[in-house]
């Protein structure tokens, strides 16, 4: 029997973050770049779900959380029994401990 593919699920805050990133990118750089960047982020979610150890531990911020960078954003996530739970997508200028 083939191995079941892991999945990712976005927390409500992460879904709002992704929408905000898309809207900001649309306003600043246009629709093509907005699609390209959010596609890059969602591809990273899929990759992390199937290989969560690619993300680095950030227990010093919040126990059990891991982080991976895409462009100017950090994906904060937890490993789950189904893959990963994406908690937040934070710009590198944001204070992660305050927003997590």
Residue spans of the language-model regions?
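Basic/aromatic recognition patch in beta-strand/loop cores that engages polyanionic ligands
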Residues: 53-82
């Amino acid at each position: 029997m083939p191995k079941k593919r892991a999945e990712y699920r976005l927390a409500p805050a992460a879904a709002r973050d992704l929408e905000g990133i898309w809207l900001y990118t649309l306003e600043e750089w246009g629709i093509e770049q907005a699609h390209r960047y959010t596609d890059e982020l969602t591809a990273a979610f899929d990759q992390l779900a199937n290989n969560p150890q690619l993300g680095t531990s950030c227990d010093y911020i919040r126990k059990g959380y891991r982080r991976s960078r895409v462009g100017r954003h950090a994906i904060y996530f937890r490993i789950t029994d189904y893959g990963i739970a994406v908690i937040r997508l934070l710009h590198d200028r944001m204070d992660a401990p305050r927003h997590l």
